[in-house]
């Protein structure tokens, strides 16, 4: 069965595979399974012969046959190498062998590609055969003109003689039960053979290291692949769609897709310039294979293959700039056709029946609906093509966008008054409403696609592509202004439930697309300032702002408001021209927001609005000198704006009322949370800006900080509210510590130290929910910032900080199995050592130069206690904490020579060595085996002689489960090497031998002789 045809009979077809009995089928399956396992561990070599490869492809071709509808049994795949167990008898014997494989796409013998499915029309006549349409002559059932407009770039590529010869040669190795006939039905047991054969081929293909003499062998493999691809993409007469892939075993199609992915990602670069491998014909077949995938997952996998290919082309053109135009021109028709067909596949206009089946409500783990995932996958490939053919890709998108916006902007003529019911849409025909629905959905998709192209219009391409970008942004601004004035989502129609979400989506997506062009607007602003011609930009930007600001009302759909808030933030932060405060609409928005007009909106929208309006006043205006920034006026404006927003919060300063009135205390929680979230958001987003911006921000928030500090004692026993308060203070310490000043910072720290008593800390740590632990962690994070502070300003707090850590927190968390707080506690202790080493070691430079004892140490008992706390963490199962503390010790040794210190050598060194070797013996932290061995080396290298003569014998004497002679052998076999590689190797051998002796001894009966 595995004998390959002789070279002299290559032109002859093999006879049809006879029905296999169970034993013959199992023999073939096990043989292929063994080959797959064999290929996983052998390199490409002469043992893998062309005859063997041809035989494997012989079996791979069986998977191309349509499954029998009479005797197709379920195949149970083995978990190992993909083996298959067939239940039942043999398959149906096939008759009427048809010869030869089909030609490559574009040849007269090839059936036309069918893309989409087009609405509800399933007329078989739409599957017309053509010799030169799109890639494969594509024409959709709903619009043949639209499909043919995309052109036949790849399909019309002439087929080289070598390709035809290769296909014919490959065909000879495949059985006649399907040499191209679409009506052949495969025996059930041959399906599994095809899957197993593809496993073997994929194992070969997954090898990245290919000897040069083996490349011809791989070339033969890929030439044989042409035949299989032609078979797979051939028209079928067994289903109404004419798609053969829909009738094949899903596992086989998946394996073949894996094959294509491996080829493109690993081997295409080897053969892309090889005259014997026609890349364009291969892409034509890959194209047909992509758009005939019967499942969305299969389609996504094929898009991933195209993404890999496009990345390869992009990197190739970038590395060889001289050949950029040649590479681009070679693949331009193919890539344009790819974009055109992806656009068809994602448009409801052509593909409504399939796209309507995609769920657009339930979110997956990536917070995407099924439709959003489908659209994103398509747009990512289009964007990849845009990196290579930016102008051509943009033109394809923009032409459709212009067409759809013409319809959208003309809808107002169909809107008429409807008495007390507002307005109504006069389009009443069902097919016209369906057409409008498709146009609106497609317009939203195109807006999103154009947003992905925004990066191609900025930087050094700004001037070159300015006209296209300007026209597009003008059009988008017009759409936003029109959407805001027309309010089409308020219009009633016979398809209200369908069209209303469509109108909302178009408006929201137009705003989101303009957000993507914020950097282009910023560069436009900059360029207009350079040439002293800002008028055109000012008109455009003002129109956009005036169309966006009225959208912040509760009557506006939430989706539109959210997009508008994101856009406004980008405009205020990225562009921020200086004249905005002079606009009446902007001035009114500050007033409305300050008086609480957006409090009914979602909190995310509120935070975006507050940040946009705050940052416009805090950040320096671009292209203006510091003297022209008008900081004084802006600071006053920001203080007034902040005061309006926080007026109610500042009234909580009277803490006596909060203490006495529990109802007021409870009702104030929401106000405290919202106010502190807003202020925290401001601080976190201003933290990396200039000192001037942070100074104005702190001046506005100074009263908020004081009030928050005053109410903290009231809520110290309520972890949820205390968590928000500590989050705010942590942001203040991280972003505005310099602006607060030393005195005020000291006051805050003293307040915290007084509040966080041992009882309070214990209460928070043991609280039933995680909020209490979060409070303690944030308190420790604030203390960490204090110990990291250079200079002597906060040195007075160091004893108190150590006391809090070791006397109040560590005793509570040390024996708890939960990792909560521990990581932050050890991080604080590490930072304490790293930044305040002289707190323990007072040695001076002079004493070091005079060879005097420079280890004048203070608080040695405390130092040892902290180090023992680190050692305790190495006895616990938490591997993340183990890694963190191991790295901490190594860092301290690198910077401060920790292991060399006398106190460490005398009191701690043996303890740590013992713990680390015990951990290696127990294999409890095997993921860190190498790191632990290196730490053992660094500790032993302090005094190798002491390690070999003192520690090692003592360690062996203390080991249970060993005989005396075994201890002697272990000690003698530990080589006294002093270089790290040899030492760590000795440690690992020592640990393995010791573990082996213990295992052997424990398995012997009592009284047995021990080796």
Give each language-model segment a name.
Residues 94-95, 168:
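N-terminal amphipathic/basic-hydrophobic helices that include classical n-h-c signal peptides
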Residues 92, 98-102, 107, 114-127, ...:
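Intrinsically disordered, low-complexity repeat regions enriched in Pro/Gln/Gly/Tyr
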């Amino acid at each position: 069965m595995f004998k390959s045809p002789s070279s002299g009979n290559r032109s002859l077809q093999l006879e049809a595979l006879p029905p296999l009995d169970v034993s013959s089928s199992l023999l073939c399956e096990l043989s292929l399974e063994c080959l797959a396992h064999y290929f996983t561990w052998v390199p490409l070599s002469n043992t893998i012969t062309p005859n063997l490869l041809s035989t494997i492809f012989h079996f791979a071709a069986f998977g191309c046959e349509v499954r029998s509808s009479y005797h197709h049994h379920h195949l149970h795949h083995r978990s190992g190498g993909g083996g298959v167990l067939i239940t039942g008898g043999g398959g149906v014997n096939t008759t009427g062998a048809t010869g030869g494989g089909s030609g490559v796409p574009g040849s007269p013998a090839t059936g036309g590609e069918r893309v989409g499915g087009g609405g509800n029309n399933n007329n078989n006549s739409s599957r017309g055969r053509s010799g030169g349409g799109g890639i494969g002559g594509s024409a959709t059932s709903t619009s043949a003109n639209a499909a043919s407009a995309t052109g036949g770039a790849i399909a019309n590529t002439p087929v080289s003689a070598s390709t035809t010869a290769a296909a014919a040669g490959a065909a000879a190795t495949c059985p006649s039960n399907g040499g191209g006939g679409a009506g052949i039905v495969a025996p059930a047991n041959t399906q599994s053979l095809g899957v197993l054969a593809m496993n073997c081929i994929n194992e070969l293909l997954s090898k990245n290291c290919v000897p040069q003499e083996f490349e011809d062998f791989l070339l033969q493999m890929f030439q044989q692949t042409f035949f299989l691809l032609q078979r797979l993409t051939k028209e079928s007469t067994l289903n109404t769609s004419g798609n053969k892939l829909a009738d094949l075993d899903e596992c086989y199609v998946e394996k073949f897709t894996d094959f294509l992915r491996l080829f493109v990602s690993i081997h295409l670069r080897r053969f892309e310039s090889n005259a014997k491998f026609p890349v364009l014909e291969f892409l034509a077949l890959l194209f047909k294979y992509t758009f005939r995938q019967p499942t969305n997952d299969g389609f996504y996998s094929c898009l991933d293959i195209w993404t890999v290919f496009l990345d390869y082309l992009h990197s190739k053109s970038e590395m060889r700039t001289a050949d950029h135009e040649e590479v681009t021109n070679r693949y331009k028709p193919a890539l344009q056709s790819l974009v055109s067909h992806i656009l068809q596949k994602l448009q409801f206009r052509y593909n409504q029946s399939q796209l309507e089946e995609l769920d657009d409500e339930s979110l997956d783990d990536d917070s995407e609906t099924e439709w959003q995932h489908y659209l994103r996958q398509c747009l990512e490939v289009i964007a990849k093509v845009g990196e290579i053919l930016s102008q051509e890709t943009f033109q394809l998108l923009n032409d459709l966008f212009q067409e759809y916006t013409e319809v959208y902007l003309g809808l107002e003529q169909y809107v008429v008054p409807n008495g007390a019911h507002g307005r109504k849409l006069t389009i009443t025909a069902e097919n016209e409403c369906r057409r409008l629905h498709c146009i609106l959905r497609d317009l939203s998709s195109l807006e999103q696609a154009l947003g992905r192209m925004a990066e191609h219009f900025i930087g050094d391409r700004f001037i070159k592509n300015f006209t296209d970008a300007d026209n597009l942004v003008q059009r988008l601004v017009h759409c936003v202004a029109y959407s805001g004035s027309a309010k089409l989502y308020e219009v009633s129609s016979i398809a209200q439930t369908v069209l209303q979400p469509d109108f909302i989506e178009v408006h929201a997506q137009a705003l989101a697309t303009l957000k993507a062009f914020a950097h282009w607007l910023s560069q436009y602003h900059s360029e207009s300032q350079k040439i002293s011609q800002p008028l055109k930009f000012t008109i455009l930007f003002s129109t956009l702002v005036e169309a966006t600001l009225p959208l912040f009302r509760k009557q506006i759909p939430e989706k539109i408001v959210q997009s508008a808030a994101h856009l406004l933030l980008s405009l205020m932060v990225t562009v921020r021209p200086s004249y905005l405060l002079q606009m009446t609409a902007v001035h009114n928005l500050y007033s409305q927001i300050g008086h609480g007009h957006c409090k009914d909106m979602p909190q995310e929208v509120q935070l975006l609005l507050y940040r946009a309006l705050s940052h416009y006043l805090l950040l320096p205006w671009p292209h203006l000198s510091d003297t022209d920034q008008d900081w004084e006026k802006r600071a006053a404006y920001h203080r007034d704006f902040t005061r309006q927003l926080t007026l109610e919060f500042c009234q909580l300063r009277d803490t006596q009322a909060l203490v006495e009135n529990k109802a007021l205390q409870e009702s104030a929680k929401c106000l405290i949370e919202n106010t502190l979230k807003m202020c925290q958001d401001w601080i976190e987003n201003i933290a990396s800006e200039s000192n001037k911006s942070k100074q104005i921000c702190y001046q506005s928030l100074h009263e908020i900080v004081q009030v928050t500090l005053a109410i903290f004692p009231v809520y110290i026993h309520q972890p949820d509210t205390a968590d928000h308060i500590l989050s705010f203070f942590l942001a203040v310490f991280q972003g505005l510590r310099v602006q607060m000043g030393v005195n005020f910072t000291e006051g805050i720290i003293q307040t915290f130290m007084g509040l966080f008593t041992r009882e309070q800390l214990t209460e928070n740590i043991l609280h039933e929910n995680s909020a209490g632990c979060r409070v303690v962690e944030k308190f420790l994070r604030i203390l960490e910032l204090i110990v990291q502070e250079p200079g002597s300003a906060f040195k007075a707090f160091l004893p108190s900080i150590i006391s809090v850590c070791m006397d109040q927190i560590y005793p509570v968390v040390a024996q708890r199995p939960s990792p909560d707080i521990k990581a932050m506690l050890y991080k604080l202790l590490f930072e304490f050592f790293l930044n305040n080493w002289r707190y323990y070691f007072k040695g001076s430079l002079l004493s070091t130069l005079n060879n005097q004892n420079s280890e004048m140490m203070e608080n040695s008992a405390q130092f040892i206690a902290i180090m023992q706390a680190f050692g305790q963490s190495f006895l616990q199962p938490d591997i993340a904490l183990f890694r963190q503390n191991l790295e901490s010790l190594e860092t301290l040794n690198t910077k401060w020579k920790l292991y060399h210190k006398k106190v460490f050598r005398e009191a701690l060194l043996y303890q740590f060595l013992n713990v680390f070797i015990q951990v290696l013996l127990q294999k409890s932290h095997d993921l860190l085996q190498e790191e632990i061995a290196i730490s053992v080396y660094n500790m032993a290298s302090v005094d190798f002689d002491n390690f070999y003569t003192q520690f090692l014998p003592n360690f062996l004497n203390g080991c249970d489960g060993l005989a005396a002679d075994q201890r002697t052998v272990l000690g003698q076999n530990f080589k006294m090497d002093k270089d790290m590689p040899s030492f760590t190797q000795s440690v690992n051998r020592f640990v393995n031998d010791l573990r082996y002796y213990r295992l052997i001894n424990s398995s012997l009966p009592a009284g047995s002789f021990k080796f």
